[in-house]
Design a protein with these regions (language model features):
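N-terminal strand-loop element at the rim of the active site
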Residues: 6-13, 26, 30-77, 177
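Acceptor-binding helix/loop patch of EC 2.4 sugar-transfer enzymes
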Residues: 64-76, 124-152
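Conserved donor-binding/catalytic core segment of Leloir-type glycosyltransferases
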Residues: 199-216, 222
């Protein structure tokens, strides 16, 4: 079995990158699958999490990181050009690899993953809840532009997701949110270890570690 994952980069610590690494390593080590990971950014940077030695990385070097900090109006033409470049290079890469399954982690490649002509089954895997995916509320765009862009993105996204063989979410709660789709499957995040003991709730302290952002829900721990 040959599986190709599409993700922007692996050089920084984050939940999506950690989960992908755990699953890819397990598939390679336990099942002996041929795992390929296709990247668009982070050329020359070492993966933050250790990968099984049999896993192959394919760096397309699109460099979306270059767009960080640019204004919307300056970024837009550059983004469109990079999307066209990614579409071409990804199709070439998949034809070279010839995977049985290609899995998009719903980053920039999801806009055209179904147009790839390599013949592999196409899956999508999302590591965000629906309300926070493609959320422009914190952008510097005027409110009316936020609405226009968000509605366009979501309509385009639903069209692409319907064409996937399966669309994978992390929980049954998440699955209930995607009412527009009938191809949703639930695969929970893996546990990297099992605790040696279970709390008896005698210590009334909670320790939370994570990025301080609205979707992490730290405010809900304090109320």
């Amino acid at each position: 079995m040959k599986i190709a994952y599409c993700i922007p980069a692996l050089y920084y610590p984050s939940g999506m990158e950690r989960v992908l690494t755990l699953k890819a390593n397990y598939f390679a080590e336990v099942f002996g699958y041929d795992i390929r990971i296709i990247l668009t950014d982070g050329k020359g940077k070492k993966p933050y999490y250790e990968l099984h030695p049999s896993i192959t990385l394919h760096q397309l070097d699109i460099d979306y990181d270059e767009l960080n900090g640019m204004s919307f109006y300056k970024k837009l033409p550059k983004y469109i050009a990079k999307q066209e470049r990614l579409k071409k290079k990804l199709n070439e890469c998949l034809h070279q690899i010839r995977p049985d399954i290609t899995i998009s982690l719903l980053r920039r490649d999801i806009n055209f993953i179904n147009q790839m002509t390599d013949g592999s089954l196409k899956l999508g895997e999302i590591h965000f809840n629906k309300s926070n995916y493609r959320d422009l509320s914190n952008s510097r765009l005027p409110a009316f532009l936020q609405t226009i862009v968000s509605n366009y993105w979501r309509a385009q996204l639903y069209r692409q997701l319907r064409q996937l063989k399966r669309f994978i979410v992390l929980s049954h709660e998440d699955a209930r949110e995607w009412t527009e789709l009938d191809n949703v499957e639930v695969i929970h995040n893996p546990l990297p270890f099992f605790p040696d003991q279970i709390s008896d709730n005698s210590h009334k302290q909670v320790i939370a570690v994570g990025r301080y952002a609205p979707q992490k829900g730290f405010d809900r721990l304090i109320s």
